Swiss-Prot record:
Keyword vocabulary terms for this entry: Activator, DNA-binding, Nucleus, Transcription, Transcription regulation
GO molecular function: DNA-binding transcription factor activity, RNA polymerase II-specific; RNA polymerase II cis-regulatory region sequence-specific DNA binding
Polar residues compositional bias, start-end: 1-12
Region ranges (Disordered): 1-35
Protein name: Transcriptional enhancer factor TEF-5
SMART domains given in the database record: TEA (SM00426)
Summary of the function given for this chain in its UniProt record: Transcription factor which plays a key role in the Hippo signaling pathway, a pathway involved in organ size control and tumor suppression by restricting proliferation and promoting apoptosis. The core of this pathway is composed of a kinase cascade wherein MST1/MST2, in complex with its regulatory protein SAV1, phosphorylates and activates LATS1/2 in complex with its regulatory protein MOB1, which in turn phosphorylates and inactivates YAP1 oncoprotein and WWTR1/TAZ.
Subcellular location: Nucleus
Region entry Transcriptional activation, spans: 171-433
Compositionally biased intervals (Basic and acidic residues): 14-28
Main location: nucleus
Entries under InterPro entries matching the protein: TEA/ATTS_dom, TEA/ATTS_sf, TEC1_TEAD_TF, TEF-5, TEF_metazoa, YBD
Family annotation (PANTHER family): TRANSCRIPTIONAL ENHANCER FACTOR TEF RELATED (PTHR11834), TRANSCRIPTIONAL ENHANCER FACTOR TEF-5 (PTHR11834:SF7)
Length: 433
């Protein structure tokens, strides 16, 4: 790896995903897939208790552990009935119920005297919801009030782009606001005459489908971010050291059933990043526009490790691609929308498991960043830290060195974590509507 040093600008806790207490082992001799009335009742209760949360984890305050929603539903069924249902069975049951909801609502829509535009809007709203959201919307609606007329009965609202705060975290900064997705008018198609009728073209082969990680993780058509961390290491003796993660993103294995990333209007954050040549606005207009993401970190500053001689502050990141390229990674630290320092690193590909991997390992932080962290940690109140962080951003741009094509552009914004379980994050896809 070839890298340059930081250059000043001329401008001024991990939750387990794979089961709990042997949940995926024995099924207590219950027939797999059989949902008796007591299990179904507990399942419905759990749906109302644990709302859909996408790929986020839910922290149980009494245990301090993080669980996925399906895992919590399975635990609830076990506690209420003594019968075991795995999180995979819960997921399958959600999908079955979702298909029933869609089928039932489709029949009701046909029976009602709705115009074509209303039908299309209802199905469009239905298509944008995950199976968990479809089922939960129905459960909560039945519990709270008699269902109003369709199509609002089950689909009272399309999923919001800006979700609620992560448990244990303050709400999002007021200067980054959600935007409403405009309703696109759908014109009913004109029925073709028999003379012009042609059979539909065959579906494209599965091999040409969009990769599962695209639109669900920080990934463009050509490059995917696998890991990212900023950390501090303090040596304890000649062979060991203590490590603290300020921010961290670990590798994930998304599936097609996972929700797509929420969208954020890029114009809301233009003023937080440089506007001159090579700034965020110019980069987005140049495209490709599926390469732009907003990454909000709740940074963990609650370190008990004492800074001292030999302390190392660094950043590590890892990317993967189906193409063999040489990439250039530009990292710009910005204050009040102005670039303060920039570091440019060049990384070459290594073939691993039929994909090309790019690793930037233990890249040293610049002095500006180290001093900034020190001053931030000495502020007496969290709200003071967040006030400072409102004007602090980082812009990372990954390009193909040979073609200068933008492969990934990640805009970082920050708040201070109030959780006892370390750093957390949320990813948004930057769009312009």
């Amino acid at each position: 790896m070839a890298s340059n040093s930081w250059n000043a600008s001329s401008s001024p806790g991990e939750g387990r995903e794979d089961g709990q207490d042997g949940m995926d082992k024995s099924l207590d001799n219950d027939a797999e897939g059989v949902w008796s009335p007591d299990i179904e009742q507990s399942f419905q209760e759990a749906l109302a208790i644990y709302p859909p949360c996408g790929r986020r984890k839910i922290i149980l305050s009494d245990e301090g552990k993080m669980y996925g929603r399906n895992e919590l539903i399975a635990r609830y069924i076990k506690l209420r009935t003594g019968k075991t249902r795995t999180k995979k069975q819960v997921s399958s049951h959600l999908q079955v119920l979702a298909r029933r909801e869609i089928s039932g609502d489709s029949s009701k829509l046909k029976a009602m005297n709705l115009d074509q535009v209303s039908k299309d809007k209802a199905f469009q709203s239905m298509a944008s919801m995950s199976s968990a959201q479809i089922v939960s919307a129905s459960v909560l609606q039945n519990k709270l009030s008699p269902p109003p007329p369709l199509p609002q009965a089950v689909f009272s609202a399309a999923p919001r782009f800006w979700s609620g705060p992560i448990p244990g975290q303050p709400g999002p900064s007021q200067d980054i606001k959600p935007f409403a997705q405009p309703a696109y008018p759908i014109q009913p198609p004109m029925p073709p005459s028999l003379a012009s009728y042609e059979p539909l073209a065959p579906l494209p082969p599965a091999a040409s489908a969009v990769p599962v990680w695209q639109d669900r993780t920080i990934a463009s058509a050509k490059l995917r971010l696998l890991e990212y961390s900023a950390f501090m290491e303090v040596p304890r003796d000649a062979e060991t050291y203590s490590k603290h993660l300020f921010v961290h993103i670990g590798q994930t294995n998304p599936s097609y059933s996972d929700p797509l990333l929420e969208a954020m209007d890029i114009r809301q954050i233009y003023d937080k990043f440089p506007e001159k040549k090579g700034g965020l606005k110019e980069l987005y207009e140049r495209g490709p526009q599926n390469s732009f993401f907003l990454l909000k970190f709740w940074a963990d500053l609650n370190s008990t490790i004492q800074d001292g001689p030999g302390t190392f502050y660094g950043v590590s990141s890892q990317y993967s691609s189906a193409e063999n390229m040489t990439i250039t990674v530009s990292t710009k630290v910005c204050s009040f929308g102005k670039q303060v320092v920039e570091k440019v690193e060049t990384e070459y590909a290594r073939l691993e498991n039929s994909r090309f991997v790019y690793r930037i390992h233990r890249s040293p932080m610049c002095e500006y960043m180290i001093n900034f962290i020190h001053k931030l940690k000495h502020l007496p109140e969290k709200y003071m830290m967040n006030s400072v962080l409102e004007n602090f951003t980082i812009l990372q741009v990954v390009t193909n060195r040979d073609t200068q094509e933008t492969l990934l552009c990640i805009a970082f914004v920050f708040e201070v974590s109030t959780s006892e379980h370390g750093a957390q994050h949320h990813v948004y896809k930057l769009v312009k509507d």
